[in-house]
Amino acid sequence: MNKIYDKVQKCYKQVKKMTDFKPQIALVLGSGLGDYAEKIKIETVIDYHEIKGFPVSTVQGHKGRFVLGYVEDIPVMIMEGRVHYYEGYSMSDVVLPIRLMKMMGAEILFLTNASGGIHRGFEAGDFMMITDQIASFVPSPLMGPNIEEFGERFPDMSHIYDEELQEVIRKSADHLQIDLKEGTYIQLPGPNFESPAEIRMCKAIGADAVGMSTACEAIAANHMGMKICGISCIANPAAGISKKPLTHEEVQQSADRAAPKFQKLVTECICRMGKSLKK
């Protein structure tokens, strides 16, 4: 058996002993959405530390637990604190939680994050729906022997972000009168913020926002046949767009200020997605 698949299986079996909850939607909380899980109808909470072999987030503001419960009547599995490649984990460990949530039953992966705005039309506090991504600067989570249990060797990436889910997000934002931006997200390895020259490069190849997560998670989910959507909170202008130095604290504070509106948008999206799953 493939070692990576074996590790995911072992984690899955441990979680199944703790709960028989079956989610429809897997939600990954980025900066600014940290306390969202506390506002749902909670069924079970599982700390990452309780799962032997599971990677644990070391980033300030990322709690490190799964919260399973209901948004309205839609069963969701929330990842409260993702792990990042820059923390020293292998890429297979970075996406292990995504694979686990799929094995738990999730059909949709809803990704959120805080990012730096590259597009000149973006301001701190804006929300960008991710319509495409660039992941060429971090290792693919699919490198190595293919895990046949998850998917095929060469998965298509033409429509990685589901168009029907994008329409759901548009309608949700319109209903809440939230100005929704759209664009391409690029993942760079981090943990250092990007240089102005790197941001100019990102802009030249078509990126609108930059961060240190998300794209690799989408690749793993796409490999397994999940429907994927994503919203990025623009926390700050990227390096060179503004002359102000970048700090993690500033990113966190900006994301926290946008949190109430972000949480309303996420809830509205999940409710609408849940209705579409029932059809």
Task: Identify the residue ranges that each predicted region occupies.
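Short acidic/polar active-site loop segments enriched in Thr and Asp
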Residues: E107-I108, D208, K227
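Metabolite-binding pocket within alpha/beta catalytic cores that recognizes anionic/polar moieties
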Residues: M1-M157
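Histidine/lysine/aspartate-rich catalytic loop segments that bind and position anionic ligands
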Residues: I134, V138, L142-P191
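Zn-dependent metallopeptidase/amidohydrolase metal-coordination segment
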Residues: M212-E250
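His/Asp/Glu-rich mid-to-C-terminal helical/loop segments that flank catalytic regions of hydrolases
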Residues: A239-K279
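Active-site/ligand-binding-proximal alpha/beta "capping" segment
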Residues: Q166, S172-D208, V266, M273-L277
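Non-catalytic positions within long, well-ordered alpha-helices that form the structural scaffold/packing
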Residues: K102-G105, K203, N222
